[in-house]
C-alpha cells in the first residue's frame, strides 16, 4: 500500500461504489487525498443536492473553507475569471472570483444563503445573470479529465457527482480539529465514525475511473533503434486534448523490482539547441543514454506547450513562474500505469511529485548521476 492507502486500512474505508451511492443520495462523504500532497480530508457532497443543513455542518463541524468545485463548462457559463493569473500556490488550486446568487438571499453568508447560491449556480435552467460577483461562495475550476488529470479534491468532487448522474459540481470543506490544526489520518477516521460519514480515497477513485475511461490510450507500438540501441516505442493519444505523447522502453520492465523511469517535457533550449537549461540536468539524449546503460528502463516524453514568452524570459534570465506539472503528472502516471508499474526509481533530482501515489505508484528513490 502506498500514499493515502497507507493511512487507511481496508476495513476503515468504503468501496468507491458505496461512496458514489451516498453522493447520489445527497449525503456527505469524506475524501482523503495523497499523503505526499495536502494529506487532508474534505467533506464532499453533490452541489445539486446541497442543503442548508449540509452547509451548516461543514461550517460548524468541518471548520474549513467551503468551496464549490465546478466543471470548466459551468465556469464558462458564468464567465468566472480566475482569482489570479499568477497562481503560485503549491497545489495550484484553481480559485475563481467568488460568487453570489443575484436574488433570494439576504447577507449571503448564512447556511441557507450559501446553499441557495450553490444550487442556483448548478441549476441547468439558471442564466448567467442569476449569479453575481463577488460573493460568499468560492468556486474552484476543475481540470478536464478530473482526477486522471489532477488528483485533487476539486476534481474528485466533480467526478463523484458526475458518476452519480448529477451535474459535474460538488461542495467541499476541509476538516479541521477542534484546536485549529488540520485533521489527519486517525483524526479523519474518528470524525467519520462519530458522524456516520463514509470515508474514501482519491486513489480508489482514480482506480475506478481508470477501469472505465482512462484519458490516455496507446495507438501504436513498434520496435525502433536509435544511437543508444533498441527500444520499444509507444505512441499515446491524450483523448481530452487530442495530443500525442511518446514512450521508449528498454528491456523487460518486469525483470526489475523498481525500474529506472524518466518522465519529462521537451526543452527547446536543451534538447533541440543543445543549450543547458538551468536546473535541468537531464536532456532527452542523456536520459536515453542512462537508461540504455542500465539495460532496463522507461522514458516518457509528454507533449507540453510552454507559454509564448517562456523561453525568451529564460534566455534573458528573468524571473519566471515555475512550470505547472499537474497535467504532466496525470498523463505520465497513466502511461506508467499502462505498463503495470508499481515501484519506480526516478531519473532526476529528488522532487515532491504530488499525487503520484494516487495512481498506486511508489517512488523508491532518485538517480541523478
Task: Show the residue positions of the predicted features.
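Short, small-residue-biased leader/transition segments that mark boundaries at the very start
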Residues: 1-8
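Catalytic domains of riboflavin
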Residues: 9-369
Amino acid at each position: 500500500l502506498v500514499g493515502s492507502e497507507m493511512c487507511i486500512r481496508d476495513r476503515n474505508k468504503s468501496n468507491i461504489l458505496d461512496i458514489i451511492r451516498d453522493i447520489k443520495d445527497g449525503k456527505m462523504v469524506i475524501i482523503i487525498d495523497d499523503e505526499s500532497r495536502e494529506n487532508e480530508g474534505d467533506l464532499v457532497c453533490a452541489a445539486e443536492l446541497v442543503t442548508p443543513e449540509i452547509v451548516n455542518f461543514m461550517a460548524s463541524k468541518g471548520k474549513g473553507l467551503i468551496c464549490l468545485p465546478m466543471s470548466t463548462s459551468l465556469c464558462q457559463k458564468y464567465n468566472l475569471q480566475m482569482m489570479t493569473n499568477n497562481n503560485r500556490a503549491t497545489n495550484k488550486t484553481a480559485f475563481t472570483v467568488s460568487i453570489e446568487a443575484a436574488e433570494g438571499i439576504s447577507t449571503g453568508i448564512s447556511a441557507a444563503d450559501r446553499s441557495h447560491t450553490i444550487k442556483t449556480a448548478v441549476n441547468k435552467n439558471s442564466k448567467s445573470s442569476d449569479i453575481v460577483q463577488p460573493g460568499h461562495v468560492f468556486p474552484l475550476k476543475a481540470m478536464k479529465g478530473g482526477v486522471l488529470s489532477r488528483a485533487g479534491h476539486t476534481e474528485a468532487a466533480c467526478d463523484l457527482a458526475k458518476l452519480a448522474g448529477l451535474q459535474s459540481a460538488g461542495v467541499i470543506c476541509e476538516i479541521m480539529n477542534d484546536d485549529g490544526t488540520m485533521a489527519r489520518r486517525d483524526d479523519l477516521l474518528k470524525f467519520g465514525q462519530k458522524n456516520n460519514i463514509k470515508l474514501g480515497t482519491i486513489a480508489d477513485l482514480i482506480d475506478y475511473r481508470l477501469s472505465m475511461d482512462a484519458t490516455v490510450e496507446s495507438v501504436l507500438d513498434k520496435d525502433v533503434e536509435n544511437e543508444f540501441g533498441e527500444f520499444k516505442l509507444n505512441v499515446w493519444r491524450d483523448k481530452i486534448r487530442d495530443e500525442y505523447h511518446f514512450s521508449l522502453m528498454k528491456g523487460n520492465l518486469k525483470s526489475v523490482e523498481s525500474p529506472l523511469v524518466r518522465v519529462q517535457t521537451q526543452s527547446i533550449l536543451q534538447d533541440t539547441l543543445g543549450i543547458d537549461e538551468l536546473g535541468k540536468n537531464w536532456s532527452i539524449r542523456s536520459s536515453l543514454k542512462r537508461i540504455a546503460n542500465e539495460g532496463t528502463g522507461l522514458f516518457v516524453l509528454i507533449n507540453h506547450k510552454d507559454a509564448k514568452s517562456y523561453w525568451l524570459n529564460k534566455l534573458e534570465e528573468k524571473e519566471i513562474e515555475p512550470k505547472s506539472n499537474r497535467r504532466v503528472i496525470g498523463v505520465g502516471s497513466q502511461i506508467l500505469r499502462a505498463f503495470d508499474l508499481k515501484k519506480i526509481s526516478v531519473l532526476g533530482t529528488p522532487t515532491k511529485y504530488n499525487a503520484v501515489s494516487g495512481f498506486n505508484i511508489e517512488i523508491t528513490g532518485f538517480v541523478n548521476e
